[in-house]
Curated annotation (Swiss-Prot):
Identification of the protein by name: SWI/SNF chromatin-remodeling complex subunit snf22
Reported function: Helicase. Component of the SWI/SNF complex, an ATP-dependent chromatin remodeling complex, required for the positive and negative regulation of gene expression of a large number of genes. It changes chromatin structure by altering DNA-histone contacts within a nucleosome, leading eventually to a change in nucleosome position, thus facilitating or repressing binding of gene-specific transcription factors.
GO molecular function, one term: ATP hydrolysis activity
Entry-linked Pfam families: Bromodomain (PF00439), Helicase_C (PF00271), QLQ (PF08880), SnAC (PF14619), SNF2-rel_dom (PF00176)
SMART domains: BROMO (SM00297), DEXDc (SM00487), HELICc (SM00490), QLQ (SM00951), SnAC (SM01314)
High-level lineage: Eukaryota, Fungi, Dikarya, Ascomycota, Taphrinomycotina
Keyword Hydrolase: yes
Family per record: Belongs to the SNF2/RAD54 helicase family.
QLQ domain residues: 429-465
């Protein structure tokens, strides 16, 4: 920091030479780009120069104030400018803005300065002096002229003028010296003139500043001392009483600081604070203050001596780096004193304020309007209030100040108006009385500005005519001491006169010895004595003073006013103040008179300097003591000693440095000249060095330097250009060579690409030719093209398929030769012809012709009297007869509804009539179709003797005698009786075995298949099915294996060759086959199946059959369904309401099945239904709780109204029960058929529904029980409520209505829940249908379709192989879309729309209604909204399992199988009641009760019951034997030491692997096998091995080949075989039995010895009962 007094750099203060050197340094640093933000030294120098500039200006204003008047000849222009200044600068200010304000800190009137009751400093900060109306000023120089003092010279600015100002000051000083040389004005004027003369070279080079004083300059701590060094060489501040208010008259333009624009009555003695800034009181800082970093004057080039030109000149911005002031300085809130109230114009059109005003965001406070202040503040404004704004019209009229009239009148005062006055001519000089009064007022003013703040009584008597006490009261000796006016508590809105009028031209009041002029207070302050209040001047209205309405006359002020005293400032404080009004604006005003005395910053600075000096002295004393040899601390390190010694010596250099600075500063003024003392021309005038020349020299040097650099740069650039040109030539040459190489390479690549393209075209052309040959069944052409192509893969594939077909051909021959021919008279061939060897010509025949070598024309039999067969039915009869003639079996796979039953009856009647084959014929049908078969036989072949083998045991016993006598042609029975009464039925040698719905034997391991294949004998076998391929090729092979066991004897080879093209449609092994390979394999498969499979579609044979249109409708989930679905999906369980109101947890098994239930209807769970509808009376909840039911609520009324009969198929009988409740609530008649419906009732239900007069429009059926063999063609609408995993079940259900005899278009509506498990089920079913389409339908097994038709159909399926959606996916449908979907005609569409409008008008549910149609989440109970943590669910699930097992309600079991024999007996027996069948696999019973007992049945009975009769020692041995095998497999490790039993201990998790339990029907694991061993579940080793093999097969089926589980299973299977061989080799089982027998005999001996000691009630059981005898004691247990 640069200090002025006591500073190390300037020990004797700032001299003109110091200032010149600082300015030169400032100029150099500014040219180098230094700013105050990034250069602290530059900021310090700028602050010092700014401070000196303020001092110059303040001294100049002080000299003007000390002069009496301006000379008339020199200052006429100045007064003219003063008079016209307001109209020039502020004529366009808006109303209410601050105009000319009298600065605080000096009196603004001729009245007395009232003493301050608080701190005696009311003249310093009292705002009453700011707000004075129009009182004449005692400092008014034109009115207080002294003839002894010469007029002051006319000056513009001490820095902007040249020698003119200094000469004027010298003349002025000489005039003063002639009168009185002791006049201080003389010395001041002479010093200022000398300073200006010596500093004239700083005329136009002084650093530019802004015309504002800085609010705070934080870079200069010590700005000005009490005085400068000397009157001659330094700038000295006069030794006057401190004034903490800057004395700048803002009644003139605050932006024009020309000396002639400043009134002569303004005291410009400015006291600078210690920090170099003008003290600012934050409570009185006005919004009109200039931005931080501004300065008072702007002495830069172009400055003119008129306010208008300066106002329109552009001032430097506060952010300009070339200005030597701190642009980032903040308001010095710590400084005491008043502030600079600057007016800020708002109308920028007249003065172009944009050029010099900064943003108002820098202002610390907003503008404060006069009318916003409380009434008490308008007359006496405290220091906390903002400077009042000024009205522009008030400023306009303020240039003509009203005068105080010498003869006041109270009535006249009320009518006076503020009228602008004309120019006032200069008055005469001051007389002696006026001069004495002026001197007294000056003394009083200085006393008030002193620290004491008290005016001596003599001065008060001279000024006021009386003496005031300390409490602001008149002394008792004065006659008017009791007439002190008081503030009134009554607030009024009377406007007050503007307190900022210029008073320089007010008339002087004479001859008032005992009175003083006081300022006029607002009318809101009444006085107690009306006589004393009369002389007060009444304030003028604001609108009159502005001059907006009319020009008023000049105000006449009273000449004789009796002022008593100032108002006690305590009257402005209301006591007490309520707490609610404590923070109001009128109670927050600060009264400066009541504030404590202000702080003297000079004393603070002096104290700070003393403290610093004392600190330095104490530190020196401490360091000296520390470095004394005797007091040295041994613990102090040598490094610390060195530091302390260095510090001590630095502190001792302080005085020497100060002395050196003083010496240097005293020498600097003498070394300023360029001339030297020893030169000859030292006394000649030396040219003064100016900054312009220095700048010019620097510019020339810089120019030369720049030119030299440019020449060097040009030389370097020329050299670089030559290098670059050479480089460019080289690069061009190389690029040309590279382009040539590249072109050659491209030509070669293009040549090879062309060759490759031609070869590819040739290969594609060859492939197309092969495909054409393949599609045309031209095998010779295909083989020839294949030889040319040399495709080894296709060749190998073709060879393999040829070999397979050759083997099949040979197998066909064997099959034909093995079947007993019987009587084949007529056109058929004899057995000798069949046994003839195959010739070379026969080898070249078609595979189909080989199978059907014998052909016979057929006609309708005569005994077939029910009607006439159609052409396609005769074709079917011909194909079945061809199989019979060629000793082959087959599959009649016509689509449902084409009359397979009638064709079969016709075939039987043909054999009876034409072939004389009387049977017996065995027809195995489902129970649901048995009645239909009987009816068809009675209709079409009544002469055929038939037996319906069914009913209770008594009825079947009567039928058995007829069977034994063979008095029948056809036996009709069901699958259950085939198994149940196998001993009887298997004894008969059947001629033909016909199985309806033959897909029941698709599993070769099933009990039905094994029973038929093992025990039943027939010459011919025929399968009737509408869906030969339901899931995969192995199921198709199972059917082929059953009818042709000699041909299709290997499932492995069949699946290996023909399942490859379908592996990429969802299987795990994906082998890439091109179109040709897939087509070749599929064609070979069709070629294999065509002789044995006969299939026609309804659309092919029945051209007049109406179409079947299927639509998939996606239904949304209700709020209840959504919550339950999320719970089940996330936690695998449902949350139900507990008994005590808490949320309970209900665990469920088979997550997929539970999700399907939720999608169908949530009320399938009784707990949920009780929670939602406790009373069970809210019928609307039945359809609002489920999306599917809500959709049906909109569809069914429309269908019933238009007469459309509807079939609705369900998977779950519980949903059918809920649907019954819904239909009953709507009073709609319905029929129901499921697995529990009796056989006799089914016929009556069908007849009732098919009756045209019936009023039943809806028939509910279960898919498995009612989807087979029923004729319901009177219905034209089928609704699939929930999709079956097997799509053919749904197709069977659809064909109940879409069949022969249907005359209407059939609409199939499939309901799918949106975004649920049902979408996955549908996609899986669609995949199965695609597989069926490729294998069966594309084969066109109708013996009449052309190869082109079959090829086109297959190709269309292959093209859409990747499609998942097809044309069946629809989103959620609105009413209009739904109407278009279910309507058949336009009339129905109009009717449906009308019904929708009626429902919307009457329904209480829907959009815009209180409740939605679907149940929302907000309507659910609270416990459904609780989010249960999964950890809590998991921990509590184990505790709830046992309780839920006991409390689980009994539900009706859903049976997808036919009724067993016992159930049928019970059904047929009216005296018995049908008991619900238990879940799980039915227990096997012995045939002991049956009269027909075969050895096989006896063996089975003994084998099953022999486990418990097995001796105990054998069971122990077997248990030990099985456990040893188990331990060997359990402890098996792989080659890397890993136990292979990890994934075989327990079955997979149902939640993680739900599809495992769909694919794997019998899961088993090592844990279950171990439990079976311990519980003696195995009767022999074979059962144990069977369980192990089942576990291995499950692993092979579910997992991919070469996977870890697959390989582990192979290793365990291999180990099992080795263990078995090892144990059998050692005969371990026999050895274990002997050991167990010996142990048992030993125990028996022990028991015989201890038998006498046993008590009678020891629990011995007689051995005669063949029971286990058990003896128990405290130590052991023995069993026999």
């Amino acid at each position: 920091m640069f200090a002025v007094q006591g500073n190390q750099k300037f020990p004797k203060g700032l001299t003109k030479d110091n200032i010149q050197s600082l300015y030169q340094q400032w100029q150099v640093m500014r040219n180098q780009g230094a700013t105050e933000e990034n250069n602290p030294e530059f900021a310090q120098i700028s602050s010092i120069l700014r401070m000196v500039q303020r001092a110059h200006y303040a001294r100049m204003q002080q000299m003007r104030n000390q002069s009496s008047e301006f000379p008339d000849a020199e200052n006429t222009n100045l007064r003219k400018q003063q008079d016209t200044l307001p109209t020039t600068g502020f004529n366009n200010l808006p109303e209410g803005k601050a105009g000319m304000q009298t600065l605080p800190g000096r009196p603004a009137s001729n009245g007395p300065t009232p003493p301050n009751p608080g701190n005696g400093n009311v003249g310093l900060n009292n705002p009453s002096y700011m707000n004075s109306q129009a009182s004449p000023n005692i400092m008014n120089a034109p009115l207080q002229r002294d003839t002894s003092v010469p007029p002051a010279p006319s000056m513009v600015h001490p820095h902007t003028n040249t020698n003119a100002n200094s000469n004027n000051l010298k003349v002025y000083a000489n005039q003063l010296s002639q009168q009185n040389t002791s006049n201080p004005t003389y010395h001041n004027a002479y010093d200022m003139a000398s300073m200006m003369k010596n500093g004239s070279r700083m005329n136009n080079s002084f650093p530019p500043t802004t015309p504002y004083p800085p609010a705070n300059d934080t870079t200069v701590n010590s700005s000005l001392p009490h005085s400068f060094a000397s009157p001659s060489s330094t700038f000295e501040q006069p030794h006057t009483v401190q004034s903490r208010a800057p004395s700048v008259d803002t009644t003139s333009s605050s932006h024009s600081f020309s000396a002639r624009n400043i009134p002569a009555n303004v005291s410009m003695q400015q006291q600078m604070g210690r920090r170099g800034s003008i003290p600012v009181n934050p409570s009185t800082f006005s919004a009109s203050s200039p931005p931080s970093g501004s300065m008072l004057a702007s002495p830069y080039n172009g400055y003119q001596n008129d306010a208008a030109s300066f106002a329109h000149s552009k001032l430097p911005s506060s952010a300009n780096p070339n200005t030597p002031f701190n642009s980032t300085a903040t308001v010095d809130v710590g400084a005491a004193g008043s502030h600079f109230p600057y007016p800020q114009p708002s109308n920028l059109d007249a003065i172009n304020a944009k050029t010099y005003f900064q943003s108002s965001s820098n202002s610390p406070a907003p503008y404060v309007y006069r009318n916003n202040l409380p009434p008490s503040a308008t007359s006496f404004q405290p220091s906390s209030s903002r400077s009042p704004s000024v009205d522009p019209n008030t400023v306009k009229s303020a240039q003509h100040i009203p005068r105080m009239s010498p003869s006041p009148s109270a009535s006249a005062l009320k009518t006076q108006s503020h009228v602008p006055s004309a120019k006032v001519p200069p008055t005469s000089k001051l007389n002696h009385a006026q001069l004495a009064m002026l001197k007294s007022q000056i003394v009083a003013y200085n006393c008030l500005n002193s620290p004491n703040g008290q005016v001596p009584p003599a001065v008060q008597q001279a000024i006021f005519g009386r003496v005031y006490g300390a409490s602001n009261e008149v002394s008792p000796s004065m006659p008017f001491q009791q007439n002190v006016p008081q503030m009134s508590s009554v607030k009024k809105d009377t406007p007050t006169r503007d307190a900022n009028m210029r008073t320089s031209k007010a008339p002087y009041i004479q001859n008032i010895p005992n009175q003083f002029q006081r300022r006029a207070y607002s009318a809101t302050i009444p006085v107690k004595n009306e006589s004393l209040a009369k002389p007060s001047v009444s304030p003028m209205p604001l609108q009159q003073s502005t001059g907006k309405t009319e020009v008023a006359k000049r105000a006449q002020f009273p000449t004789n006013v009796n002022y008593s005293s100032c108002v006690d400032p305590r009257t402005y404080v209301k006591t007490p103040i309520p707490f609610s009004k404590f923070s109001s604006s009128e109670n927050l005003s600060l009264i400066p008179s009541l504030l404590p005395p202000s702080i003297s910053w000079d004393d603070v600075f002096l104290s700070s300097e003393i403290a610093i000096a004392c600190s330095i002295a104490n530190r020196i004393d401490f360091l000296e003591k520390e470095n004394r040899p005797k007091s040295v601390n041994k613990k102090i390190l040598q490094q610390d000693k060195s530091k302390s010694m260095i510090e001590l010596r630095c502190l001792r250099l302080l005085e020497k440095q100060r002395s050196l600075r003083e010496t240097i500063n005293s020498v600097i003024p003498h070394s300023d000249s360029l001339a030297a003392g020893n030169l000859r021309l030292m006394f000649r005038n030396v040219k003064r060095q100016t900054m312009q020349e220095a700048n010019l020299v620097l510019a020339l040097a810089e120019k030369q330097k720049t030119e030299h650099a440019m020449r060097q740069k040009e030389k370097l650039l020329t050299h670089l250009r030559s290098i670059m040109l050479h480089r460019k030539s080289i690069v061009t040459k190389v690029d040309k060579q590279n382009k040539a190489k590249t072109q050659r390479c491209k030509d070669i690549i293009n040549f090879h690409a062309h060759l490759e393209k031609e070869e590819k075209k040739r290969i594609e052309r060859s492939a197309r030719q092969r495909l054409q040959a393949l599609r045309a069944d031209d095998e010779a052409a295909y083989l020839q093209l294949l030889d040319k192509a040399k495709d080894t893969r296709i060749t190998h594939l073709l060879k393999q398929t040829d070999q397979y077909l050759e083997n099949l051909t040979r197998a066909v021959r064997i099959q034909q030769s093995n079947i007993h021919s019987g009587n084949t008279s007529g056109k058929g061939s004899n057995s000798a012809e069949l046994e003839a060897p195959i010739s070379e010509e026969d080898k070249n025949l078609d595979y189909f012709k080989v199978a059907h070598r014998i052909h016979e024309e057929v006609e309708q039999p005569k005994i077939f009297v029910g009607g006439t067969l159609k052409d396609y039915q005769l074709k079917g009869l011909e194909w079945m007869l061809s199989l019979y003639n060629n000793n082959l079996n087959g599959i009649l796979a016509d689509e449902m509804g084409l009359g397979k039953t009638i064709q079969t009856i016709a075939f039987i009647t043909y054999l009876i009539e034409k072939k004389n084959q009387q049977g017996p014929f065995l027809i195995i049908v489902p129970l649901s179709t048995l009645t239909n078969w009987i009816m068809e036989f009675e209709k079409w072949a009544p002469s055929v003797k038939k037996i319906a083998y069914k009913g209770p045991p008594q009825l079947r016993k009567t039928l058995q005698s007829q069977i034994r006598s063979s008095n029948f042609n056809v036996l009709l029975t069901t699958f259950e009786y085939i198994i149940k009464d196998r001993p009887l039925l298997s004894r008969i040698k059947w001629v033909h075995m016909i199985i309806d719905e033959g897909h029941r034997i698709k599993n070769t391991q099933s009990k039905l298949t094994s029973t038929l294949s093992t025990y039943y004998h027939s010459q011919y076998r025929l399968i009737l099915t509408g869906t030969p391929l339901q899931n995969n090729l192995p199921e198709l092979w199972a059917l082929l294996n059953f009818v042709l066991p000699k041909i299709f004897n290997s499932i492995k080879s069949f699946d290996e060759w023909f399942n490859t093209p379908f592996a990429n449609t969802g299987g795990q092994d994906k082998i890439g086959l091109n179109e040709e390979e897939a087509l070749l394999i599929i064609k070979r498969l069709h070629k294999v199946l065509r002789p044995f499979l006969f299939r026609r579609l309804k659309k092919d044979v029945e051209k007049e059959l109406p179409d079947k249109v299927e639509k998939v409708i996606k239904c949304p989930l209700s709020g209840l369904q959504l919550k339950l679905y999320q719970q089940m999906k996330k936690h695998g369980m449902l949350f139900v309401d507990g008994e005590k109101g808490k949320t309970g947890i209900k665990g469920l098994q088979n997550t997929v099945m539970q999700l399907k239930k939720i999608c169908n209807h949530p009320f399938i769970f009784e707990d949920v239904e009780r929670a939602i509808d406790p009373s069970g009376t809210n019928v609307d909840l039945l359809w609002r709780a489920a999306g599917k039911f809500e959709l049906l609520d909109r569809i069914l009324p429309k269908l019933f109204l238009t007469g459309h009969k509807t079939l609705m198929f369900f998977q779950m009988t519980q949903i059918m029960t809920i649907m019954e409740d819904y239909l009953r609530s709507k009073n709609w008649k319905y029929l129901r058929l499921d697995g529990s419906t009796k056989s006799d009732d089914r016929c009556s239900l069908l007849a009732q529904f098919n009756d045209p007069k019936s009023d039943v429009y809806i028939f509910m059926l279960s898919t498995r029980a009612g989807g087979l063999g029923l004729n319901l063609q009177t219905a034209d609408t089928v609704i699939i409520f929930d999709t079956d995993w097997n799509p053919h079940q749904d197709l069977q259900a659809q064909d109940r209505a879409h069949r022969i005899g249907q005359t209407k278009e059939v609409r199939i509506l499939r309901l799918i829940t949106e975004k649920s498990i049902e979408e996955n089920i549908l996609s899986r079913a669609q995949y199965k249908l695609d597989l069926d389409g490729k294998v069966i339908q594309a084969g066109k097994f109708d013996n009449k379709s052309t190869p082109e038709e079959r090829e086109a159909f297959l190709r269309s399926l292959l093209e859409h192989d990747g499609d998942d959606d097809h044309d069946l996916t629809y989103g959620e449908l609105q009413d209009d879309e739904l109407n278009e979907l279910i309507s058949r005609t336009d009339e129905e569409l109009v009717l449906f729309k009308k019904l929708d409008k009626e429902r919307a008008a009457t329904d209480i549910y829907g959009k815009g209604k209180p409740l939605e149609r679907l149940l929302t989440v907000n309507e659910l109970p609270d416990f459904y909204k609780v989010e249960v943590d999964s950890f809590a669910v998991q921990s509590s699930s184990e505790l709830e399992d046992q309780y839920l097992e006991r409390k689980r309600r009994r539900r009706n079991s859903i049976s997808y199988t036919e009724l067993t024999l016992d159930e049928l007996n019970t059904v047929d027996d009216p005296s018995s009641t049908l008991m619900p069948r238990k879940r799980g696999r039915p227990r096997k019973k012995t045939n002991s009760g049956s009269s027909l007992s075969t050895p096989l049945s006896q063996e089975s009975s003994l084998a099953r019951s022999g486990r418990k009769n097995t001796p105990s020692y054998k069971q122990k041995a077997l248990r030990r034997y099985c456990m040893e095998i188990f331990e060997r497999l359990y402890n098996l490790q792989s080659e890397d030491g890993r136990f292979v039993n990890g994934l075989f201990l327990y079955p997979p998790n149902r939640k993680l692997y739900p599809d495992y339990y769909i694919i794997i029907k019998r899961p088993i694991a090592l844990g279950k096998i171990k439990r079976n061993i311990k519980n003696d579940r195995y009767g022999d080793v074979g059962e144990l091995i069977a369980d192990f093999m089942l576990m291995f097969n499950n692993a092979y089926t579910y997992n991919e080949e070469h996977s870890i589980v697959y390989e582990d299973a192979k290793l365990m299977e291999k180990t099992l075989k080795e263990v078995i061989e090892d144990l059998e080799k050692n005969n371990s089982l026999h050895a274990y039995e002997e050991e167990a027998l010996n142990e048992e005999q030993a125990s028996l001996v022990f028991l015989e010895n201890s038998e006498a000691e046993l008590p009678l009630d020891s629990g011995i059981v007689s051995a005669e009962d063949d029971k286990v005898i058990t003896y128990e004691d405290s130590s052991s247990s023995y069993s026999e």
